[in-house]
Amino acid sequence: MKIPIKKLRSNAELPVLQTKHAAGYDVHACLDSNLILEPNKVTLVPTGLSFEIPQEYHFEIRPRSGFSTKNQILIPNSPGTIDSDYRGELMIPLFNLGNIPFVIEHGMRIAQLLIRETHYTNWELVSEFTDTTERGTGGFGSTGH
């Protein structure tokens, strides 16, 4: 599959797979100078990239596991969704869960991008469901530990 990608700044880096069978493409910060993530705040980090995602697909943006666990940096709306009709710059929201400022440098791998198929549906309004289940309406802990 080919997905058109545009570099909005010359120093932007294309997403890359780190291993042959990786599912997520690493996304890099695109910065002119270091960016400070203050504790307990969300900061939008630019990637310098925009995409022409095919209509039947969307992107999911997820944290990189090592980056998150080692640095206490999260993506607050994980997974983030990038719709096929969005043409602006891919920005990654990062939340510093730690107690000290964290420095983001140009080229740092800050997130993973996954390409997902989008499924469209026609909702069918009903007054009752025809299929009952053992679980029924039980939620939040109803299936035990």
Curated annotation (Swiss-Prot):
Alphabetical list of Pfam families matching this protein: dUTPase (PF00692)
GO biological process: dUMP biosynthetic process; dUTP catabolic process
Keyword S-adenosyl-L-methionine among UniProt keywords: no
Keywords of this entry: Hydrolase, Magnesium, Metal-binding, Nucleotide metabolism
Alphabetized InterPro entries for the sequence: dUTPase, dUTPase-like, dUTPase-like_sf, dUTPase_trimeric
Binding of substrate, residues: 64-66, 77, 81-83, 91
SUPFAM superfamilies on file: dUTPase-like (SSF51283)
Keyword check for Chaperone: no
Known pathway: Pyrimidine metabolism; dUMP biosynthesis; dUMP from dCTP (dUTP route): step 2/2
Catalysis: reaction(s): dUTP + H2O = dUMP + diphosphate + H(+)
A GO term for molecular function: dUTP diphosphatase activity
Cofactor: Mg(2+)
Enzyme Commission (EC) number: 3.6.1.23
Family: Belongs to the dUTPase family.
HAMAP family in the record: dUTPase_bact
Functional description taken from the UniProt entry: This enzyme is involved in nucleotide metabolism: it produces dUMP, the immediate precursor of thymidine nucleotides and it decreases the intracellular concentration of dUTP so that uracil cannot be incorporated into DNA.
Protein name as annotated: Deoxyuridine 5'-triphosphate nucleotidohydrolase
The species this protein was found in: Leptospira borgpetersenii serovar Hardjo-bovis (strain JB197)
Gene label: dut
